[in-house]
Curated annotation (Swiss-Prot):
Sequence segments annotated as region (Interaction with RACGAP1): 661-999
Entry's Gene Ontology BP terms: cell differentiation; chloride transport; meiotic cell cycle; spermatogenesis; sulfate transmembrane transport
GO molecular function, one term: chloride channel activity
Catalysed reaction, written as an equation: sulfate(out) + chloride(in) = sulfate(in) + chloride(out); oxalate(in) + chloride(out) = oxalate(out) + chloride(in)
Bias type Acidic residues, positions: 893-903, 912-947
Protein name: Testis anion transporter 1
Compositionally biased tracts (Pro residues): 684-696
Membrane-traversing stretches: 94-114, 118-138, 140-160, 201-221, 231-251, 269-289, 306-326, 355-375, 391-411, 428-448, 454-474, 495-515, 545-565
Localization per record: Membrane
InterPro entries: SLC26A/SulP_dom (IPR011547), SLC26A/SulP_fam (IPR001902), STAS_dom (IPR002645), STAS_dom_sf (IPR036513)
Family, per entry: Belongs to the SLC26A/SulP transporter (TC 2.A.53) family.
Originating species: Mus musculus (Mouse)
Pfam families linked to this entry: STAS, Sulfate_transp
Length: 999
């Protein structure tokens, strides 16, 4: 009660206090972050030096700490023997060792009865003692009891059928004593022992090799459900095998597929011959052990069960030595064994090739049984086991037992449970049990010959029944995880019906299949933003989540491989309303066989080929386009998006629109391809000496210009409102080669469709795989990789609001305001208009220092101004209120780069310039009050200078126009970038531009 109160007060104390963090930093992409922060290389300790020589590698790779860790890994007993607590653990280990030793003696005696192989009992004893010592030194489980396990040894029946030493009567359950008088009996018996020894030797070699090669990781792929199901199936096999001792009858023993059903049928047939005394002794033992569970002994705060197994074995052994009972015991079986001890010999290596399959199945079954049992015990006591070390330990145990002509050893399910519940805490209990077993078998073997087999069967069944409790937990497991429940049922049914070896293989294969399905059936979530936070969640989970206009965020919840990358592709295309359409035949023909007449008619589709270099390959075979595209210009869109998408012209166009993502490769070719781009994409503008069109013509000219040039986020563009796609790779730790190819194709397809793809939260290993596989190109650069999802969203919003859009400034403030915290609203929103006007300039400075230097903005700026002047004058005369609030505190020189580049204005004195500007300001309102815009007279030839007042009035009008900043920033970047740049980066003085086709 006091603990609950303290927890409640703790929770109340910290839930009432809101924790707020406020972080101000730059938006980082992967390229900028790597430039500002140096990666840590291989160093020696805390010294920041590069390890370049072999001596440095040896010095840094070898240390006293690493040596100790290696020794503790190879010899785990050094860890617990140095920390052993004698006062707390000694009594429990002694009692557990005595109980296990006394149980192991009769189990060794009746081993021949269950495995149907007459193995000398002293050979089993010596091999079990040596194996226990080896596992204490090399094993990692503290409560494991190593020794013979009859279910594993029973798998050798298929081997013994090839060389039966008593005509197979022992396997069939009929003991004919006359067989032992045959002269060839001893020869056949020695051959069968050699077969067992060779199989055990090869099993040990396989297990030792698996441990050396680190194959223990395979056990980690088996979930807890598969381990629980396999142990439950083993427990059920044990119960069925003990029916021989419980009923006191002998039946023919089967091993292999469907053997479980065959054995049940045989027991049902022999049930009328059951021994009632054996059944009564079995019930007595089970009741006594059940009562013992209610008796608890505590020693130094550690619970210890009363050693009832020790009392039952000693009591019934003493009772049967005084009173004759009509029940089955091991005395008859011991009399049938011709030798009590066989000296160690080398296995017969000539028959190893004949037992490879049997050795493989035995090695897998014994290894998995040991590892799964050790993991279950270790989880109960809150420590970890080393699967590779256990494989090495059990391999050494089987190698040693093969020289004693003994069967395969593994962890015993019943003895391990007895050692655990009797109070054993460390492997010292296993040493005590092995010593007790050796002492009793050497000195008092005959004392246990009269122990009833039913009593031993009751002890074994009482300790393995708890493993069947997993069957009762199936409904709850189904509610928790259906995949785990299916794995449990498949493992259990296959191990029961097909045997432990085949069932294990089926369980492994099915578990791998389920894990593969679950890992590759990845979830692609569409994320939205929690308002006023940098938290992004699934749009279907929370009501408060809002979608960011124009930005689609997709989160990949697992690794991306060749299996699920197509699912990701279809999901993204579906959410963005795009479909994959093959090129039509006429479009392909137009693309590659366009005639010169068609080029002359439509100069917007003119493609220039450099014959000195090879034509770049078409990167996107199938063009990603919108289903509701305009039919009249589909060929133009195909040429732009599919053919010129990998060329220089489209490359420069996209870089003008997205200055943040300028790659290093494109910077080298941007100056060379600028003239070609100008010819290929600029519309047919009127010459300078032609009269300006009226307002209606200006509007149609602007519309045709917007249709001819791919203007982002416009209604006439062949795309919807989505301008940025963000892929959240924070949960992705691996991308294979095929997935990289598909991702690159996706990025190029969206790049050609004028949609920017950003990737956020990439792990370092994923970035390295991108770099190794040449993932980055024109469609996706390293500058498009952001450290966090919020960085990518901020970049997408700044890119959106720095260009003309359909949103008003109020809507822009509302959208951007949601990305700031409450504490930043007052400070940041006041400068929102200033920041939106300079976003591209700042982005170009971050993306590439030479971006403003490489662009050539001064070549056709005056021409663009002449086209824009009629529209601006018409808007001013009609009283249109744009309400863009772009009256910034900037100089006129910063707003109008054209005035700076005019040599005649710059040559005038300042006083004369100011007086002329004041005169123009007084005459300007008269111009604005005119109801209609009259056509201006035809300008004079370029050689004659224009009158100064008229030119200054045009310059002033352009500087005061709000759209001037937008279109200048969109096409060439704002003039602030030129004013801030060093003197050598300022563009040259602009000259009049003559079109080649002007009249």
């Amino acid at each position: 009660m006091q603990t609950e109160r303290s927890l409640q007060s703790f929770s109340n104390r910290y839930t009432q206090i809101p924790f707020v963090y406020d972080v101000k930093r730059s938006v980082y992409n992967e390229e900028n972050f790597q430039q500002e922060h140096r990666k840590k290389g291989p160093t020696s300790g805390n010294v920041d030096i590069d390890i370049t020589t072999f001596k440095h590698h040896v010095q840094c790779g070898c240390s006293w700490h690493k040596f100790l860790r290696c020794m503790l890994t190879v010899f785990p007993f050094l860890e617990w023997i140095c920390l052993y607590r004698f006062k707390d653990w000694l009594l429990g280990d002694l009692l557990a060792g005595l109980s296990v030793g006394l149980v192991q003696v009769p189990q060794g005696l009746i081993l021949s009865l269950l495995t149907r192989q007459l193995i000398p009992p002293l050979n089993v004893t010596y091999a079990a003692f040596c194996s226990s010592v080896i596992y204490v030194i090399f094993g990692s489980c503290h409560q494991m009891s190593i020794g013979p396990f009859f279910l594993v040894s029973a798998l050798m029946i298929n081997v013994l059928k090839d060389r039966p030493f008593n005509n197979g009567h022992l396997i069939l359950g009929t003991f004919v004593k006359d067989d032992f008088s045959v002269p060839t009996f001893y020869l056949s018996y020695n051959r069968s022992l050699s077969m067992v020894a060779s199989t055990t030797f090869l099993t040990g070699i396989i297990q030792l090799s698996m441990g050396m090669l680190g194959m223990g990781f395979m056990a980690t792929y088996l979930p807890e459900a598969a381990t629980s199901a396999y142990l439950a199936a083993v427990a059920l096999h044990i119960i069925l095998a003990q029916m021989t001792c419980i009923l006191g009858i002998m039946v023919s023993f089967h091993a292999g597929p469907i053997s479980f059903i065959y054995n049940i049928i045989n027991y049902c047939i022999a049930l009328p011959k059951a021994n009632s005394t054996s059944i009564l002794l079995f019930i007595t033992s089970v009741v006594a052990l059940r009562i013992n569970k209610c008796i608890r002994i505590t020693f130094n705060r550690y619970p210890i069960e009363f050693p009832m197994e020790l009392l039952l074995i000693l009591g019934f052994s003493l009772l049967t030595s005084k009173i004759t009972m009509a029940t089955e015991n091991s005395k008859m079986l011991m009399n049938m064994i011709p030798y009590s001890f066989v000296f160690p010999e080398n296995p017969e290596f000539g028959i190893l090739s004949r037992v490879v399959l049997q050795a493989l199945s035995l090695s897998f079954v014994s290894s998995f049984l040991l590892i799964s049992l050790g993991k279950k015990i270790a989880n109960f006591h809150n420590y970890r086991t080393n699967s590779n070390q256990d494989l090495i330990a059990i391999g050494l145990c089987n190698l040693l037992s093969s020289f004693f002509k003994c069967c395969v050893f593994t962890g015993s399910l019943s003895r391990t449970t007895i050692q655990d519940k009797s109070g054993g805490r460390q492997q010292f209990a296993s040493l005590v049990g092995a010593g007790v077993m050796l002492l009793l078998m050497v000195k008092m073997e005959s004392f246990f010959h009269n122990l009833p087999n039913a009593v031993l069967a009751g002890i074994i069944l009482s300790n393995v029944v708890p493993y069947l409790e997993a069957i009762y937990n199936l409904p709850s497991l189904w509610r928790q995880d259906q995949y785990e429940c299916i794995i449990w049922m498949v493992t259990f049914s296959s191990a029961i019906l097909l045997g432990l070896d085949v069932g294990l293989l089926i369980s492994l294969a099915f578990t791998f299949f389920v894990i593969t399905i679950r890992s590759h059936r990845t979830k692609i979530l569409v994320l939205g933003q929690i308002p006023n936070t940098n938290i992004y969640r699934n749009v279907n989970d929370y009501r408060e989540v809002i979608l960011i206009p124009g930005v689609k965020i997709f989160q990949c919840c697992s690794s991306i491989t060749f299996v699920n990358v197509y699912h990701l592709k279809q999901k993204v295309l579906k959410e963005v309303n795009m479909v994959k359409l093959p090129l039509k035949e006429e479009e392909i023909y137009t693309l590659f066989h366009e005639s010169e007449t068609s080029i002359a008619e439509n100069k917007l589709c003119r493609c220039f080929c450099d014959c000195e270099e090879l034509e770049p390959e078409i990167r996107v075979v199938y063009t990603e386009r919108y289903e509701n595209r305009q039919e009249q210009d589909s060929s133009i869109n195909l040429i732009r998006c599919s053919y010129l998408g990998s060329g220089d012209s489209s490359q420069v166009t996209s870089e003008e629109q997205i200055p943040y993502t300028v790659s290093s490769t494109s910077q080298r070719n941007i100056v060379q391809s600028y003239e070609d781009t100008e010819k290929a994409w600029l519309p047919n503008s009127p010459p300078r000496n032609s009269p300006l069109p009226p307002p209606e013509a200006s509007e149609s000219l602007a519309q045709s210009r917007s249709r001819s040039i791919i203007m982002p986020y416009s209604d006439t563009s062949v795309q919807n409102n989505t301008h940025t796609i963000i892929l959240d790779f924070s949960m992705v730790h691996y991308v294979d080669n095929r997935a990289l190819v598909i991702l690159r194709q996706m990025c190029n397809a969206f790049y050609n469709a004028n949609i920017l793809v950003l990737i956020s939260g990439c792990h370092t290993s994923v970035v390295k795989s991108f770099e190794k596989n040449d993932f980055f190109d024109e469609g996706i650069t390293k500058a498009q990789l952001f450290l966090s999802l919020h960085d990518a969203v901020l970049f997408a919003l700044s890119r959106k609001f720095s260009e003309p859009s359909d949103l008003s400034m109020d809507e822009t403030e509302t959208v951007i305001q949601e990305t700031y915290s409450e504490s930043d609203k007052n400070g940041n929103l006041s400068n929102l208009r200033l920041k939106t006007g300079k976003a591209i300039i700042e982005g170009s400075q971050h993306a590439s220092p030479g971006f403003t230097k490489n662009l050539k903005p001064g070549k056709d700026d005056l021409e663009f101004d002449l086209e824009l002047d009629p529209m601006l004058s018409f808007e001013q005369s009609s009283g249109m209120d744009l309400n863009l609030d772009l009256d910034l505190d900037l100089d006129q020189s910063e707003l109008d780069p054209g005035s700076e580049l005019d040599s005649e204005i710059q040559a005038k004195p300042e006083l004369e310039l100011e007086s002329e500007l004041e005169t123009d300001a007084q005459t300007e309102p008269e111009t604005e009050e005119e109801p209609e815009l009259e056509p201006e007279p035809e300008p004079e030839p370029e050689t004659e200078p224009e009158p100064e007042p008229e030119r200054e009035r045009k310059t002033r009008t352009r500087s005061q126009s709000p759209w001037r900043n937008y279109f200048t920033a969109y096409r060439f970047g704002s003039s602030n970038s030129q004013s801030r740049a060093p003197p050598q980066t300022r563009p040259e003085k602009r000259k009049p531009h003559n079109y080649p086709n002007s009249p």
